[in-house]
């Protein structure tokens, strides 16, 4: 059986939670009132609750929802992690269906491919840009420099 867990990690769930902590700290440092696990009713005519990784409390004046993705190029060949990018596409759909008035942020890990000469976030925008709602911001976290840039 092949193990698709990231090398050096306890589990992929731990990786995701650790990355959410980084995103949470980033937005708190910027002065935003951010909480974890924000539930919103999403959908067209029929609605269903969806839990976003981070966001502002429901009664906040400035409304923000954030989804965090710490995916990397598939190792060792820097192949496209196609299955993982379908999760990014699903996130775009949830952002599209979210209530109006929310600032929508996809917070991703910067992973640069020398083979492709671009980050996974840049690749996603280039390849799937037609699926990204115009009001979604994609922010890329560089774990080496501990910095964030808007793509």
Could you say what each language-model-derived stretch is?
Residues 1-42:
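Acidic-basic catalytic patches of nuclease active cores, encompassing PD-(D/E)XK
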Residues 14, 18, 22, 49, ...:
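Short, well-structured alpha-helical interface segments that form or flank functional binding sites
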Residues 14, 18, 103, 123-151:
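Charged, structured surface patches that assemble and position nucleic-acid processing machinery
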Residues 30, 57, 97-101, 131:
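Alpha-helix C-cap/termination motif
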Residues 38-40, 107-112, 140-144:
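Acidic carboxylate-rich catalytic motifs and surrounding loops in phosphoryl-/glycosyl-chemistry enzymes
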Residues 38-56:
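N-terminal interaction modules that seed assembly of large macromolecular complexes
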Residues 52-70:
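Active-site beta-strand-loop-beta-strand hairpin of nuclease catalytic cores
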Residues 68-127:
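Catalytic cores of nucleic-acid endonucleases
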């Amino acid at each position: 059986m092949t193990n698709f867990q990231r090398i050096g990690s306890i589990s992929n769930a731990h990786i995701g939670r650790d990355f959410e902590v980084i995103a949470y700290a980033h937005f708190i440092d910027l002065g935003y009132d951010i909480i974890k696990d924000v539930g919103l009713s999403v959908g067209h005519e029929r609605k269903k609750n969806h839990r976003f990784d981070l966001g502002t409390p429901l009664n906040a004046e400035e409304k923000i929802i954030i989804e965090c993705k710490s995916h990397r190029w598939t190792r060792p060949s820097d192949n496209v992690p196609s299955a993982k990018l379908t999760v990014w596409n699903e996130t775009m759909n949830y952002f599209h269906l979210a209530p109006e008035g929310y600032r929508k942020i996809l917070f991703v890990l910067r992973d640069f491919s020398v083979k492709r000469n671009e980050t996974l976030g840049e690749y996603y925008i280039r390849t799937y840009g037609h699926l990204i709602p115009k009001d979604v911001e994609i922010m890329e976290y560089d774990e080496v420099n501990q910095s964030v840039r808007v793509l």
